[in-house]
Regions:
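Membrane-embedded alpha-helical hairpins and interfacial helices in multi-pass inner-membrane proteins
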Residues: 42-52, 80-204
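Hydrophobic transmembrane alpha-helices
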Residues: 13-73, 77
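Intrinsically disordered, low-complexity non-transmembrane regions of multi-pass membrane transporters
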Residues: 1-21, 185-204
């Protein structure tokens, strides 16, 4: 009696239609992040620019940990548009966009490591990346002078970094981390995944 023919293992591939749908979803998500970020910065312009700022829209930065490239691209484009209206020139437009892309990418990669506390560490590094880049070029283009506090000379660059760091501590590490925890709940990511959206969670 002949044995039944061996059926080769088959790994399904995404067809052109499904791949196109996923690309459309990712593009829409990037556009959504870009729009919300830009609108948030422009509407809250008085507290979103200069060395001492609390850019509330930066609460979206940790979303790069959860959504990867669609969020990174959206936050980069959103910053580019927002900073164009900020009045600080092309250095702010380019520098802020680079800061968002670098911070988002690094945070996403740290989040993918999935060690205990990886998301918290990722948001701290995100803050430090934004602080280092934005604080430096704002010090440069605004020529921030040294300041004297209680007889101690504080370099202008240090003051600029401190201003950005404290604002990002509120926007990224407090508001953003809380938003990240809320959106990572199964009740939220379940419907997103059912529509073909890739979500990176600690459980994967």
């Amino acid at each position: 009696m002949e044995s039944p023919p061996t059926v080769p293992l088959y790994k399904p591939r995404l067809g052109g239609e499904n791949l196109g749908r996923i690309n459309a979803i990712n593009s829409a998500l990037s556009a959504l992040f870009a729009a919300i970020y830009a609108i948030g910065v422009i509407m809250l312009a008085p507290i979103s620019f200069m060395p001492f700022q609390v850019r509330i829209a930066d609460c979206l930065m940790p979303m790069a940990i959860l959504f990867g490239w669609p969020a990174i691209i959206g936050l980069t484009l959103g910053c580019l548009v927002a900073n164009f209206f900020g009045g600080l020139g092309y250095i702010d437009v380019i520098g802020g966009s680079v800061a968002n892309m670098a911070a988002g990418f690094i945070a996403w990669k740290i989040g993918l490591r999935r060690f205990h506390g990886s998301w918290f560490v990722a948001t701290i590094v995100e803050n430090l990346t934004v602080t280092a880049i934005v604080g430096f070029y704002l010090w440069f283009i605004l020529a921030i002078p040294d300041v004297i506090i209680n007889g101690i000379v504080v370099p202008g660059l240090a003051a600029s970094w401190a201003g950005i760091f404290m604002g990002s501590l509120v926007a990224i590490n407090a508001l953003g981390y809380a938003l990240l925890r809320i959106l990572s709940r199964s009740s939220v990511i379940g419907p997103l995944r059912s529509h073909g959206l890739r979500v990176y969670t600690k459980e994967e």
